[in-house]
Amino acid sequence: MWPYFTKTHASSESRHLPAIALALVIFCTGCMSWSWADESSTAVKILVTYHSLSGNTERMAEAVAAGAKSVSGTQIVLKRVGQVTAEDLFSADAVVVGSPVYWSNMSGEVKAFFDNWQFKFGVFPEFKMKNKIGAAFTTGGQISSGKEMTMLTILAAMLGNQMIVVSGGGAFGASATTEGESPGVDDKELAEAKALGRRVADVAKLIKIGSLR
């Protein structure tokens, strides 16, 4: 009886093999679909915005954008502060703001941009910028012209909106000294700006992945 039982059992198993194979195909296809969906859903949008008269802050902004773009799954919007729309602002997962140093502070154009978050775009009382990533960069003529103070005022405005601020390139962000022995923006300063962009993109992706769990 034992050989007969073994043969019958094996025959029964063989009849179920097509069904098992089909189930495995469906399972694997489902896993692939979830993988594609996860990759799409974790794509992050990063707004890099700035004010620039001489072109120095604009060069830094372009480097920040390039650094962010080097991280996979990112969509970059690069605009001057006066061109940013409510859609640009509220659809972004991260906002990086750059300003030249004016009297040890952000420029009037950048200050007006932050004021417009409420007066033009209406961020309150819902705190529409809450948990978005924020970062700053700046340019100034001299070493002690107020670059750190300018970045801190930008970050303070972001913190007031319950954003998550990050640094990169330097302690408070990326900066460039545009006069003296190295006029304009040099390669080292552009590298710091790119590093800031990459850091913002990396953190924004981590936050977005965590929010989907």
What are the roles of these predicted feature ranges?
Residues 2-21:
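Bacterial N-terminal signal peptides that target proteins for export
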Residues 19-31:
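Bacterial N-terminal signal peptides
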Residues 73-83:
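A short beta-strand-loop structural module common to alpha/beta enzyme folds
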Residues 82-168:
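Helix-loop-strand module that forms the ligand-binding subsite of alpha/beta enzymes
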